[in-house]
Amino acid sequence: MTRENGEIRLVNETEIYCDAGVSLTKVCRFALEHSLSGLEFAFGIPGSVGGAVFMNAGAYGGEIKDVITKCEYMTADGTRGELNSQEMLLGYRTSVFNKNNCVITGAYFKLSKDSQDAVKERMNDFLSRRKAKQPLEFPSAGSTFKRPEGYFAGALIEQSGLKGFSVGGAQVSEKHAGFVINKNNATAKDVMDLVKYIQKKVKDDSGVDLEPEIRIFN
């Protein structure tokens, strides 16, 4: 869930703070406005800062762990705390928050000065690549599966003949098989049934286990 009125502010000349509910796209635009480089890779990634930290979001050679310095969190009993980047144990689509019951409330990013033109050019380049290859015209949670070692999830799904395959209103994108999209008022059950079917079909066809990149809450 994103909050477009959440706080984003400069901490110093090259560091910014943002509330966890702020959208990544808004943070990227704030960085551009202040001629700060480092978050261009995140421009166009759906979701919030908190979700990006939780999963160590990344694309095009960049990851949240490359720019985050610390985050603020709150435990189930209301206790507040901070973790530095090392303490967050950020890895491929994972963090320490995957294993505890904390809620991320804010994050600090250390960026670098660059010209607005250069930052904007990189942002637009990454967004153009996304538009060309990803189904941004439909709602989705982004890339559905983690990249299995030695393979690409989208290629395996396509090899199993599942491009365009639907369950209810959920569909394997015809543009990029690594995305499950909401094509027509999909329910959570539609999405989960489709994800499970994809996992079974790819396992049967290729012997590869696909692990969801999206976080599932029952």
Language model: regions and residue ranges:
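Gly/Ser/Thr-rich helix-start
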Residues: 22, 45-52, 59-62, 143, ...
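Phosphate/pyrophosphate- and phosphate-bearing ligand-binding catalytic cores of soluble enzymes
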Residues: 74-193, 197-218
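A gly/ser-rich beta-alpha-beta helix-loop segment of oxidoreductase catalytic cores
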Residues: 31-69, 75, 140
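Residues embedded in well-ordered beta-strands within globular domains across many folds
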Residues: 9, 40, 72, 214-215
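Structural signature of FAD isoalloxazine-binding scaffolds in flavoprotein oxidoreductases
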Residues: 1-7, 54-85, 100-106
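Short N-terminal helix-initiation segments at or just after the protein's N-terminus
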Residues: 15-19, 43-53, 88, 118-126
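Anion-binding (especially nucleotide phosphate/pyrophosphate-binding) glycine-rich loop
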Residues: 1-49
